[in-house]
Amino acid sequence: WLNQPGMLGFRFSFTQPPQATWPTDGTMDWIWPEAERLGIPVALMASNYMSMVAPIAERYPNLKLIVDHLGRVGGKTDAECFATLPEMLALAKFPNVAIKATGAPSYSSGSYPFNSIHDYLHQIYDTFGPERMFWGTDITRMPCSWKQCVTMFTEELPWLSEADKGLVMGKAVCNFLAWDISE
């Protein structure tokens, strides 16, 4: 499957009841060393399992880990949603961990341009840098249009330089995953 174009790694969501215990019951224990050995990156919806990410990142320093959805729990917004942000920011000390800003608009109680979460995004950017902060949409559950999901990052975050925008909006994830999209 890794020889198929665009197939680069695993993504685990742990959102279905049978999967909910996998991160803590040993089910996933074999994945980490094998993924590291084979150079397969792993993306995680780790909002309820953030405490497991640091030990994995430390034990398997060559395993690329991407925390999806900013490490947030769905259904919460603003300060309530970002209450555990310090725990996620602490992961920046591991160069093999990156953050995907998937679904960012949904974590704001406001409307476009979702100003109530800009400071949180800025903290993530300041901590992880543009090389390890990746844009994403999860468009099917966004409170805005596709264009607004894009322009929130490309036009509404003044602290992103043009070079940073290029990284956050796609170049950085390609670099992080060694994903050659030139073909």
Regions found by a protein language model. Name each.
Residues 1-48, 55, 100-104:
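Active-site gating/metal-coordination segments in enzymes
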Residues 5-8, 36-41, 61-64, 93-97, ...:
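Short, well-ordered coil/turn segments that N-cap beta-strands
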Residues 10, 35, 69, 99, ...:
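Conserved, mostly hydrophobic/aromatic
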Residues 23-30, 50, 79-87, 113-121:
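Charged helix-capping and loop-helix junction motifs
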Residues 45, 56, 66-72:
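Conserved anion-binding
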Residues 54-58, 76-82, 109-119, 139-155, ...:
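Histidine/acidic-residue-rich catalytic or RNA/ligand-binding cores of hydrolases
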Residues 85-127, 133:
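Aromatic-anchored helix/helix-loop segment that forms the rim or "lid"
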Residues 122-123, 127-134, 141-183:
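Mid-to-C-terminal alpha-helical segments outside catalytic/metal-binding sites
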